[in-house]
Amino acid sequence: MAEAPHTLKFERLRKRPDFLLAAKAPALSRGAVFIQMRQRTDDDPTVRVGFTATKKIGGAVERNRAKRRLREAARLVLPLHARPSHDYVFIARGGTGTREWARLLDDVKTALISLAADLDRGGTKVSRRSNGALHDAAPSSQPDPTVSG
């Protein structure tokens, strides 16, 4: 792989409050990975990275395998696509542990590129609907069907 244009320092996110702050930031799902990207307000250029897997994807063995694969994918892709002073949280999805390696790397890369492009466009937040599906939280010109008037 090519070297990053600038050398970034990486640290792991380990504390729950950091994960909760990232949960309020823009996020994107691609294939077997869900990534949250939070821009910090401090002047520290360090990139902080966290990994998580819920019990929905399986038992401890499956969760650990998924997180190991996400850590390695992040180690390879983040130096090329991470932004200084940002926190990234990688959340394993159902196929993370079994997805073909090249496809998982592509999922991570395209998610990071899309999140960065979204931030450059103004950072519309991606959020969850009540049914768990993702939608763009930017204001829509469509009237809200739940509002009568």
Curated annotation (Swiss-Prot):
Record has Lipoprotein as a keyword: no
One GO term describing the cellular component: ribonuclease P complex
Annotated TM spans: none
UniProt KW tRNA processing keyword: yes
Compositionally biased spans, kind Polar residues: 139-149
GO MF term (any one): 3'-tRNA processing endoribonuclease activity
The enzyme's E.C. designation: 3.1.26.5
Record InterPro entries: Ribosomal_Su5_D2-typ_SF, Ribsml_uS5_D2-typ_fold_subgr, RNase_P, RNase_P_CS
GO biological process: tRNA 5'-leader removal
Broad class of enzyme this protein falls into: hydrolase
Region (Disordered): 123-149
Known catalytic reactions: Endonucleolytic cleavage of RNA, removing 5'-extranucleotides from tRNA precursor
HAMAP family assigned: RNase_P
Protein function: RNaseP catalyzes the removal of the 5'-leader sequence from pre-tRNA to produce the mature 5'-terminus. It can also cleave other RNA substrates such as 4.5S RNA. The protein component plays an auxiliary but essential role in vivo by binding to the 5'-leader sequence and broadening the substrate specificity of the ribozyme.
Protein name: Ribonuclease P protein component
Organism of this sequence: Caulobacter vibrioides (strain NA1000 / CB15N) (Caulobacter crescentus)
Source organism phylogeny: Bacteria, Pseudomonadati, Pseudomonadota, Alphaproteobacteria, Caulobacterales
